[in-house]
């Protein structure tokens, strides 16, 4: 349940997010591989088994979870479900085979993880090579972009990132954002590099009065305020702005 998820410690909640995101990002490959290893398909009378196999396989193949830990957790999840308990042995066997068949998962899987209609559109607009490159890029967890109040090089070093030409700090750090240095003191906020450019185009705004219309969730408002502007932020979603500030 959502309440149970929110009650998890930060690190565990971050892992859950990564597992779910990885399953969605690699769903085609996961289902293909599991299908190859299941002689008769997933048990129709225990729908949760497919979910358990998907999350377990994702942990084994793409996350930094030891094979034995992913298998053990998946088996225990099956045992805890009334309808899935009888298939705990199946879960154990399939996931052990997954751990031994990693190469199968990485064999030309780009098309499997991309909706056919989308791949066709990309191919039509950009050509087959570029379409394939886009699909491959979509298979990777994106970088995290941060806008910092000041001293971008210092914060880039602290979060193990780099400063982009736009001034954004980009890092490949994964896990709970709240655990990164600078989060508690509000030294930075998450904002895509492209989203930060419009406010930077104003140049020196120190002492100027700026109206930020349609301001939620507040990233550009925070940028302008940090740069010394007197900002009036307006939006129907005021709660989102207040949360950001």
For every predicted segment, state its role.
Residues 1-245:
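S-adenosylmethionine
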């Amino acid at each position: 349940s959502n309440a149970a998820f929110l009650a998890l410690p930060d690190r565990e909640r971050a892992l859950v997010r990564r597992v779910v995101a990885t399953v969605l990002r690699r769903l085609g490959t996961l289902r293909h591989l599991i299908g190859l290893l299941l002689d008769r398909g997933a048990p129709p009378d225990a729908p949760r088994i497919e979910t358990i196999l998907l999350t377990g396989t994702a942990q084994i193949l793409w996350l930094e979870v030891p094979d034995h830990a992913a298998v053990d957790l998946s088996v225990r999840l099956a045992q805890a479900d009334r309808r899935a308990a009888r298939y705990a042995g199946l879960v154990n066997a399939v996931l052990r085979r997954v751990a031994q068949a990693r190469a199968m998962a990485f064999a030309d899987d780009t098309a499997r993880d991309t909706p056919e209609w989308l791949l066709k559109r990309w191919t039509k607009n950009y050509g087959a090579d570029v379409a394939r490159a886009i699909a491959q890029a979509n298979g990777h967890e994106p970088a995290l972009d941060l806008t910092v109040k000041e001293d971008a090089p210092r914060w880039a070093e602290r979060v193990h990132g780099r400063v982009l030409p736009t001034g954004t700090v980009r890092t490949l750090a994964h896990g709970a954002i709240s655990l990164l240095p600078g989060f508690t003191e509000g030294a930075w906020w998450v904002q895509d590099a492209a989203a930060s450019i419009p406010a930077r185009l104003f140049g020196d705004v120190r002492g100027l009065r700026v109206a930020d219309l349609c301001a939620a969730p507040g990233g550009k408002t925070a940028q302008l305020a940090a740069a010394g502007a007197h900002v009036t932020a307006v939006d129907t979603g005021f709660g989102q702005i207040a949360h950001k500030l």
